Amino acid sequence: AWSQIVDAAVESGLVVTLSAGNEFGSATGAGCNTIDSPGDSRLPITVASLDKDLSLAIYSSRGYTSDGRVKPDVAAIGSNIMAPNQGTGTGYTSKSGTSMATPLMAGIVALTLEANPDLTPAEVKDTLVAGYSIEREILNDDPDAASNNCSILETRPDNEYGYGQADPLVFVEIAGKIDPDVSVNWT
């Protein structure tokens, strides 16, 4: 139900960013295929969490969705983020999670739309295809890939990083150059 509501919001013209969830390293032993609603929605941008060294955070949920689609769409730093301390109302505290990575992606989307306010939600999402910046050898050089048995794809997007790390500068540069006649189909 939530996924349908979020997809409807995107269809109405809103660019929506969603957290992938924090189920990979949970106490339940969850692993791959841990992205649930609403992170499994078709149309919004689903965000995984990176550690400061740009490796995927152990807690960040991985795809595939229950119907076999690749998610997340992109990854952003979400570990050890300084945030207001809600408990005391004063000061700051360190927080980690995909819910800390998602606001970073929302900010990147805002900068992208500032550079090109005429972009549709689909065109903003298309910038993911051209704007990813993590280059890595999947399976061959990633010792964690074999141990987590997530069937990581050797192409982008994959079910851990999506299209890779969100790079604000690249997204804004691409937004200014997007040809509205070119699009990528999301299935």
Which role does the model predict for each range below?
Residues 36-114:
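Extracellular S/T/G-rich loop segment that most often corresponds to the catalytic His/Ser-adjacent loop
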Residues 4, 54, 100-103, 107, ...:
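Generic recognition of stable, solvent-exposed alpha-helical segments in well-folded globular domains
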Residues 15, 21-25, 52, 80:
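Catalytic metal-binding/acid-base residues of hydrolase active sites
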Residues 114-187:
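C-terminal subdomain of the subtilisin-like protease fold in secreted/lumenal serine endopeptidases
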Residues 1-18, 29-48, 58-76, 120, ...:
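Mature extracellular/periplasmic domains of secretome proteins
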Residues 24, 89, 173:
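Positions that flank functional sites
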Residues 21, 97-99, 162, 167:
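Residue-level detector of functionally special positions within alpha-helical transmembrane segments
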